[in-house]
């Protein structure tokens, strides 16, 4: 059988090297986010960013990781072990290698998944590059509300009841064990308590989403050019 020659230069792509880059979305599917955001908020935001970056660059969107993990003391959803998450990613990587992909950008939008950082670094070798980029904000608070609106998963009607006084997972204000065991969580919760009610800033959400997409486009561009010095630009927070 004659070898099929593919037109790697076709379409709207940065360059032919993007065909060696795969984008993986990582979030969580079963996690409470108050009343205005769905339980799979993190997975949907990560997928939205990843797919749009793929469209704008030509890199391949490989899909979303099903399992997710979390710190044992953060109790607001159903999660898996770090090893289960990484094993799933390994399967995605192995199948992707068969279609010529050897560079992987994982866009993670769930704080608990930062636990896999060291395990992910072990997947790198001379032939494979795996980069984990974390986009994590205070849980179900200002940033997630804003970006949720921009993505289209926020219920504006349910914002009326989206309060940390009712839903303890918002800002993790009511998650006592998590606040006692993690100073970062406690500090973010204190900031939210001081601000009081959560409000929706639609313009901020649109700007935040645009910046996140553009930032990851730049990361893919650097990856396609062989630049190992990639990283996320600082995001202005409310």
Swiss-Prot record:
Molecular function in Gene Ontology: 2-amino-5-formylamino-6-(5-phosphoribosylamino)pyrimidin-4(3H)-one formate-lyase activity; ferrous iron binding
InterPro entries per the UniProt record, alphabetical: Creatininase-like_sf, Creatininase/forma_Hydrolase, FAPy_deformylase
Listed SUPFAM superfamilies: Creatininase
Binding residue positions for Fe cation 2: 33, 42
Complexes and interactors: Homodimer.
Classification via Pfam families: Creatininase (PF02633)
Protein EC: 3.5.1.102
Pathway: Cofactor biosynthesis; coenzyme F420 biosynthesis; Cofactor biosynthesis; riboflavin biosynthesis
Keyword flag Disulfide bond: no
Cofactor: binding comment: Requires one Fe(2+) ion for activity. Requires an additional second metal ion that could be Fe(2+) or Zn(2+).
Cofactor(s) the protein needs: Fe(2+); Zn(2+)
Assigned protein family: Belongs to the creatininase superfamily. FAPy deformylase family.
Top EC category: hydrolase
Any single biological process term in GO: riboflavin biosynthetic process
Protein's UniProt keywords contain Nucleotide-binding: no
Recorded catalytic activity of this chain's protein: 2-amino-5-formylamino-6-(5-phospho-D-ribosylamino)pyrimidin-4(3H)-one + H2O = 2,5-diamino-6-(1-D-ribosylamino)pyrimidin-4(3H)-one 5'-phosphate + formate + H(+)
PANTHER family listed in its UniProt record: 2-AMINO-5-FORMYLAMINO-6-RIBOSYLAMINOPYRIMIDIN-4(3H)-ONE 5'-MONOPHOSPHATE DEFORMYLASE, 3-DEHYDRO-SCYLLO-INOSOSE HYDROLASE
Protein's job: Catalyzes the hydrolysis of the formamide of 2-amino-5-formylamino-6-ribosylamino-4(3H)-pyrimidinone 5'-monophosphate (FAPy) to form 2,5-diamino-6-ribosylamino-4(3H)-pyrimidinone 5'-phosphate (APy).
Lineage: Archaea, Methanobacteriati, Methanobacteriota, Methanomada group, Methanococci
Binding site for Fe cation 1: 31, 42, 110
NCBIfam families noted in UniProt: ArfB_arch_rifla
Name under which the protein is recorded: 2-amino-5-formylamino-6-ribosylaminopyrimidin-4(3H)-one 5'-monophosphate deformylase
Keywords assigned: Hydrolase, Iron, Metal-binding, Zinc
